[in-house]
Amino acid sequence: MLSETNIIELFKAKTPLKDVQVDIGDDAALINLQNNALIACKDLMVLGTHFPEELSAYDIGRRSVLVNLSDVAAMGATPKYLLMGLTLPQELNNKFWMKDFARGVHQICKAYKCRLVGGDVCRGPLSVSVTLLGDPEGRNIITRDGAREDHDLYVTGNIGDARAGLENILESKRVDLRNQCTRSFVSPIARVELAKRLTKHATSMIDISDGLYNEIKILADCSSKGFVIDSNKIPISTALKKKYKHRSVEIAFTGGEDYELLFTLPKGLESWITKLSKKFSVKISKIGYCTSSKSIKLLNYQGEKLEQRTYDHFRK
């Protein structure tokens, strides 16, 4: 069994950053800010609610950072510093599990050039809480309330794969990363660099964590607007269609855990979006447009009503 000090040592940074003056091991981190603005977000991952027991320590470590990176990306900022809280059951408190978890955290931090600067650990049911700080670096901050009438609505990637991936794991009781949908759940992609470019024209933006329909409704409510959505334009993978057949659009609307970007743009920017799509090798689909109606209208949709199908942690 590792002591708290042993665990903390596993997370000490391997590459120093000049703006971090006081690091892990002190009572708090000291960071020199070059700009006045700071983006802050927090996500909590709990075993059985946010991830199944089949995930490895490495994958849990990676995913705990990635879902926070997606929140910072949704505002167009650059991720910089992480604070992590870890509750750990005694049976997992061993050097093998902890080293694997720490390796996952460090791997994503290195890939996205951000830094774990502090945190806490205690015994309890497995959960990971991450606070991520980001720097706008002088770019526009994209919030959820800027959609305007006639603005186009876009989404990145394929929607619904992560839901299918989670069900694959729960059904088979194993993690098969050869499966496209399973990979989408285990290792989502934070669209950080693309989001930075989107700040040039995007008027509102949100990441898709709790289902596409739910996030569309949030943008509508925050902007006091509505949307018309063409269900035929929702980007759905062949793998999702194969698994759910005629229910694939419904699953895309309600599934959650995709961590793709949903955003609005003024009309007439299709060629600009096409260039970004090619540059970042990311599918970007126009799925609808904004209205003044304060309601969501779905075209070409044949599935169940969606209002009561959106994800809510506290809904039974």
State where each predicted segment sits.
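Glycine-/charge-enriched secondary-structure boundary and capping motifs
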Residues: 1-13, 90-115, 123-126, 133, ...
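Internal active-site segments that recognize and position negatively charged phosphoryl groups
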Residues: 151-157, 187-212
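Residue-level signal for inorganic ion chemistry
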Residues: 30, 68, 76, 116, ...
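Extreme N-terminal cap/leader segments of soluble proteins
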Residues: 1-56, 75, 84, 108
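Glycine-rich anion/phosphate-binding loops
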Residues: 20-22, 53-69, 91-103
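A short, N-terminal amphipathic alpha-helix
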Residues: 64-75, 109-110
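A short, charged helix-loop
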Residues: 168-189
